[in-house]
Curated annotation (Swiss-Prot):
Matching Gene3D superfamilies: Urease metallochaperone UreE, N-terminal domain, UreE, C-terminal domain
Protein known as: Urease accessory protein UreE
Cytoplasm as UniProt keyword: yes
Species per Swiss-Prot/TrEMBL record: Klebsiella aerogenes (Enterobacter aerogenes)
Pfam families (alphabetical): UreE_C, UreE_N
Record localization: Cytoplasm
Swiss-Prot/TrEMBL GO biological process terms: protein folding; protein-containing complex assembly; urea metabolic process
């Protein structure tokens, strides 16, 4: 089996590719199937978020596999009003929803409850099968995540 152990800082020409959803691109140890049918194992540093276009390599530097962000079921909000888009980001972020933010557009994993909430704000929500590249904060490693005990001595409100 091919073991992919590093993400290249300067991508090389890919010899293969692998199409992965976000839920797999956040894992550091996982078995995957390359697009050519070969099995491979990801043995990557913990906390590494793979993006579409990243190139992974084996330890020997003889195989170069390009990551392709898989099409996923996402809700899509398009809006030309920055205030309304900010309002949507606020409410989705307050619910810790992994969110892809682009100029005039938001994407999140399809959820009819969230769709209905945003429609109540007057936004148009559609559905699509599209690549999903959420902000890294939604998938931060534990050492950088959002956690603390209630006995911590600082204010924090939602």
């Amino acid at each position: 089996m091919l073991y992919l152990t590093q993400r290249l800082e300067i991508p090389a020409a890919a010899t293969a590719s692998v199409t992965l959803p976000i839920d797999v691109r956040v894992k550091s140890r996982v078995k995957v199937t390359l697009n050519d049918g070969r099995d491979a194992g990801l043995l990557l540093p913990r906390g590494l978020l793979l993006r579409g276009g990243d190139v992974l390599s084996n330890e020997e530097g003889t195989e170069f596999v390009q990551v392709i962000a898989a099409d996923e079921e996402v809700s899509v909000v398009r809006c030309d009003d920055p205030f309304m888009l900010a309002k949507a980001c606020y409410h989705l972020g307050n619910r810790h929803v992994p969110l892809q933010i682009m100029p005039g557009e938001l994407r999140y994993h399809h959820d009819h409850v969230l769709d209905d909430m945003l429609r109540q704000f007057g936004l148009t929500v559609t559905f699509g099968q599209l690549p999903f590249e959420p902000e890294a904060g939604a998938y931060a490693s534990e050492s950088h995540g959002h956690h603390h005990a209630h006995h911590d001595h600082h204010a924090h409100s939602h």
